[in-house]
């Protein structure tokens, strides 16, 4: 087979979703770069396929050293790249390997398949015409709040990953950043036996998921209403002008007039934001 790098999606919870092409690539690849070699071998066993190539680990903490090595191998061999679940390069260092390969003229091909991002988006019932994948929110409170705050005005549907242990505090932080009324969906254990999908407002979800849960989590959040997004920007500008020395009431009036909002709405929202 042609020397190249092959990115292949693996099941995110249901082995029945493994494609015939995935099984074929596992059997034929000269080298298999797996996020966790033991989990990969377990998956191959369940799928009834026997890898014929060398199996190497490839994950975030060895990517800097292993990536260039895999690229060199791909000049003369077929290198299959897989993660524990889903598509390599999504919340995964695989994209850097692809970037290097493209720059070096090494062929890259993709075996499509299961994706937690698209599965969560599809089952959420939220708008799919425009969306963004935001990965995991930062673990530390201050960094997480700034991360989410910067997305408060994002008009596209947003998809996040989260660990079961941090889900309660992340939902609470989303309530603060996006508002309790923003529609969202918590997706747990997608495609698995105990799959759970709960759509409600962020406030309701934060109340429901107060304790740690089990399983893989994706959270889908509706984009901001355009008017609310404009108001959020106006509030930030007003507070910035106040910090520069202008009275908040005057700052709100100035910004409201410029963007076409009611000065009362901007002023009251700025007071609420300031606390």
Where are these regions (language model features)?
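A contiguous loop/helix-start segment that scaffolds small-molecule binding in enzyme catalytic cores
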Residues: 2, 78, 157, 161-275
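Glycine-rich, flexible N-terminal cofactor/catalytic loop recognition
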Residues: 1-61
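Conserved helicase motor
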Residues: 56-64, 137-140
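A short, charged helix-loop
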Residues: 5, 131-153
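Short active-site oxyanion
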Residues: 26-32, 105-109, 157-158
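General beta-strand structural signal in soluble alpha/beta enzymes
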Residues: 34, 83, 110-113, 160, ...
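Short glycine-cluster motifs
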Residues: 75-138
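Short amphipathic alpha-helix with an adjacent loop that forms part of the alpha/beta core around
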Residues: 67-75, 150, 210
